[in-house]
Amino acid sequence: MRKFISILIIVSTLLSYQICRAQSSPKYIEVEWQNGSEAAKRIMISKFYYDPLDSWSPFGNDVGSDTYYLYCDWKREHSNQNVKGFLEEELINFGYPGFDLYIDGNDPEKLKGIVDTMVNKYIDLNAINNIVISLAFSQLFLDGRIEREIKKWAEAAFSRELMYLDFWDSEKGEMEKRQKRMNQLLSDLRKG
């Protein structure tokens, strides 16, 4: 009987330990400088990266923040799959399957033609761009590197955003601030 009670105590202790450990284990790595990869700590040094209220941060706008957490979930479940599958899935969920992620601002008429077919025009394009840019910086933050194709897509996203920079000119100086931030993000992206 003593042996049975001892075994029962040991098993219940181990079980309690596993339950406590599982509850204290975070599902997501919070976007804070100290939690980033070594490369992210070197490259993503500006405070805006870690400000959840900064709408021009890759993780501060709603779409960018959602992309980070959705990518964390996807990565956990699809660790051996190409990240293009994640991005295609997000574009389908957003209502733009097959959007050409390589299209940039070098052909303004073609891009404007595509944007004109979108339900919410530039707002939808901006959301697509935010998904791509957030994914690139999510990879840098979590993995310490940005896949070559993701980097190309993000560079194209910045190029598309530059075409619509005047959208952000509602307040004096806002457009210039946005352009300065985009230049910094693009520079940091290229270091990743």
Summary of predicted features, one role per range:
Residues 80-81, 143-147:
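Charged, low-complexity interaction regions
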Residues 91-123:
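Acidic, Ser/Thr- and Gly/Pro-rich intrinsically disordered linkers and low-complexity segments
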Residues 126-143:
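Amphipathic alpha-helical elements of HEAT/ARM-like alpha-solenoid repeat scaffolds that form extended
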Residues 158-192:
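Eukaryote-biased recognition of C-terminal alpha-helical segments
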Residues 1-23:
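Bacterial Sec-dependent N-terminal signal peptides
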Residues 73-100:
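Amphipathic, membrane-active segments
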Residues 150-159:
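Alpha-helical repeat scaffolds
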